């Protein structure tokens, strides 16, 4: 049994418990101070299947954020726009999306909301290692077959991408009624593959190989007559005219489904576990933490020290009084330095606007930040 400080609310513990195949219990169940994570004795297949479904519905980072949006709206969350005014109310549930691929959701305490005590944040990312489709990607090879021109996106293992059914998903910028609109697209069938050479054509294959992405890993799209069909198929999948597409952000994705395996079915395998496993588990935690905790109470806000270092405990994190925040950023795989990445102003902008909407000044914001806790959730690290 692992004991955690009771100041950490359930939305922190759940992602940890989920990935360890365990569950959370409270001090009232164990008689021990703080929350505990204990071995789970019930079937976990339903939860794992929910994870697999989430991943299947999220073939790109844009789809992942859209899937989370649907879950949040089903739970009664209201979308805010960065370009609009925010009028937050006690007990309100909100989310905001940036660039279609990053999302932040939060809840305002139901009582005495102006005096909230800090933020409790779990942050993950929506993108996964993949191959990005280049503009005008069709490459006619010796007039016999067509490959797609791609570039590596993120830190990947190259070998597992070979000999698997792949397809293409992402986002389009489309001209519609003299306006620019975005549309998600997913070619929902096995479309391309990156084939391995037969062993007699590469005798060194089993001795380790330094893959050249532009030579060895261009996906095979079709025979010679496939030339000129790629964007037509993309347009058809998005239900738009091909000449209405002005720009695209498209990625390969693995079509293989997740599986539960092992002697005792103790392992899972799936595409995009980096990092949709954490995006899913933190979203589940965020939504489930709406339920009041049995030991929920209001305590004095004090600062503790252990070995000369400040720590977060039940004295300075007030259950039910802090603001839980669910963050999912894009472009972690390529350094997070974009407008929608973790290194952007997205999180700070959102927290500052929450603080302002609740009628607090800058000093109150600084105090809130000092009383906050953030968990970076990336299961591959």
List PLM regions with ranges:
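N-terminal hydrophobic/helix-forming segments and targeting peptides
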Residues: 2-381
């Amino acid at each position: 049994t692992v004991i955690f400080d009771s100041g950490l609310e359930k939305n922190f513990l759940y992602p940890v418990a989920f990935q360890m195949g365990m569950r959370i219990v409270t001090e009232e169940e164990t008689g021990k101070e703080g929350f505990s994570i204990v071995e789970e004795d019930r079937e976990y297949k339903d939860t794992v299947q929910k994870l697999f479904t989430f991943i299947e519905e999220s073939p790109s980072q844009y789809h992942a954020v859209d899937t989370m949006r649907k879950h949040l709206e089903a739970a009664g969350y209201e979308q805010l726009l960065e370009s609009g005014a925010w009028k937050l109310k006690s007990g309100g549930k909100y989310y905001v999306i940036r660039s279609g691929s990053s999302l932040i959701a939060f809840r305002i305490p139901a009582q005495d909301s102006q005096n909230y005590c800090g933020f409790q944040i779990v942050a993950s990312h929506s993108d996964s290692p993949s191959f990005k489709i280049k503009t005008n990607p069709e490459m006619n090879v010796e007039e016999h077959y067509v490959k797609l021109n791609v570039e590596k996106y993120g830190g990947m293992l190259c070998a597992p991408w070979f000999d698997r059914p792949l397809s293409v998903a992402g986002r389009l910028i489309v001209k519609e009624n003299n306006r620019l609109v975005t549309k998600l697209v997913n070619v929902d069938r096995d479309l391309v593959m990156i084939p391995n050479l037969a062993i007699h054509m590469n005798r060194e294959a089993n001795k380790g190989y330094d893959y050249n992405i532009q030579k060895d890993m261009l996906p095979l799209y079709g025979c010679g007559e496939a030339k000129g069909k790629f964007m037509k198929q993309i347009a058809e999948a998005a239900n738009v005219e091909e000449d209405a597409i002005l720009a695209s952000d498209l990625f390969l994705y693995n079509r293989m489904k997740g599986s539960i395996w092992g002697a005792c079915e103790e392992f899972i395998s799936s595409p995009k576990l980096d990092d949709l496993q954490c995006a899913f588990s933190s979203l589940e935690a965020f939504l489930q933490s709406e339920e009041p905790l049995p030991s929920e109470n209001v305590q004095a806000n004090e600062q503790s020290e252990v070995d000369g270092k400040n720590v977060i405990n039940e004295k300075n994190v007030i259950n039910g009084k802090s603001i839980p925040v669910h963050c999912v950023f894009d472009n972690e795989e390529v350094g997070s330095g974009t407008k929608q990445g973790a290194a952007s102003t997205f999180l700070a902008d959102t927290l500052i606007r929450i603080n302002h909407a609740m009628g607090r000044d800058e000093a109150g914001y600084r105090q809130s930040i000092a009383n906050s806790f953030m968990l970076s959730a990336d299961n591959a690290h």
